[in-house]
Amino acid sequence: MIKAFLIERRSWIAAFLFQQALMLFIAFVDPSISFGNVLYMVYLCILFFIIFLWFRYRKETAFYKSLKTWENNLDVTAINEPETPFEAMVERSIAGQTEHLKQTAARHRLALENEKDELMAWIHEVKTPLTAMHLIIDRMEEKALKSQLSYEWLRIHLLLDQQLHQKRISFIENDLSVEFIQLQPLIFKEIKDLQSWCIQKGIGFDIQLEAKEVLSDAKWLAFIIRQLLTNAVKYSEASEIEIKSFQKGEQTQLQVKDCGRGIDPKDVPRIFDKGFTSTTDHHDQASTGMGLYLAKKAAAPLLIHIDVESEFGAGTVFTLTFPIRNQFEHVISV
């Protein structure tokens, strides 16, 4: 701030120093003027000018320092009262800009809310014909066509479900109902929903649930597990997916292990990034790069930690670590 102040006042400083140099020059060339007396006056003037600059620095920069607070929260009351006409002009301009920004932000929030409501309404509307399509597919007798249509129906269903949860996830804290959940029925339901896809790809499941229940939100935990299972099925062929739960110390862990293509080591730190698919399979148009991102985002307010271990070409293990009860007290209170 001092450097900026001196740069701002450089014309003042240059003019003052030129004036003092001129006085010394005149005293030097004019023998009738005592050079020592003029030098003493110049010394006093410079000392006074330094004190004056320090006083003006303290006074003038107080207003501009208060602008830093305004930048963080757009609160005009945080700005110091202007003490000069120029500061008053700045304050009026900032107040006008603040009001404009707040109105613009309010309009954008309203537009986003309307867009979210319209999209969610559309998704719910689409679910009606999807349900009818599923009933029609179930009554089909030609097995090959039925299997293919069931797979395509499932893809649409999963994409709609992902989109629906993506819009809801911003308000997840208002949508939590934390309770003890039985893992077996929850996992079995998710596997059943993927049945047609798994049959088509020749995938089975090896389920070993030593830990029977966890403390979480049933709907959002199901969504997280759904993303891990769809990810495992998508990248596996003719193999088994292992699902295990067990106690590790005071915490419960749930593992989903596949024998698929695995993840390139350089991609592992990025798999939870929004929109990231892969650096090795850009031809894969089916991947959206949203499933694991949403799973990670949904896990955070539930205090679920997601770890991943992968060997490229050999498979991947995702581990969910659930919190103990006393870690969950503030979430339960929500």
Swiss-Prot record:
Domain Histidine kinase: 121-326
Domain of life: Bacteria
Primary location group: membrane
Cellular component terms (Gene Ontology): plasma membrane
Function statement: Member of the two-component regulatory system BceS/BceR involved in the regulation of bacitracin resistance. Activates BceR in response to extracellular bacitracin.
Extracellular side: 34
Topological relation to the membrane, as annotated: Multi-pass membrane protein
EC number: 2.7.13.3
Organism per entry: Bacillus subtilis (strain 168)
Any one GO biological process: phosphorelay signal transduction system
Known catalytic reactions: ATP + protein L-histidine = ADP + protein N-phospho-L-histidine
Residue numbers of Phosphohistidine PTMs: 124
Name under which the protein is recorded: Sensor protein BceS
SMART domains from the UniProt entry: HATPase_c
Membrane topology (Cytoplasmic): 1-12, 56-334
A GO molecular-function descriptor: protein histidine kinase activity
PROSITE patterns per UniProt: HIS_KIN (PS50109)
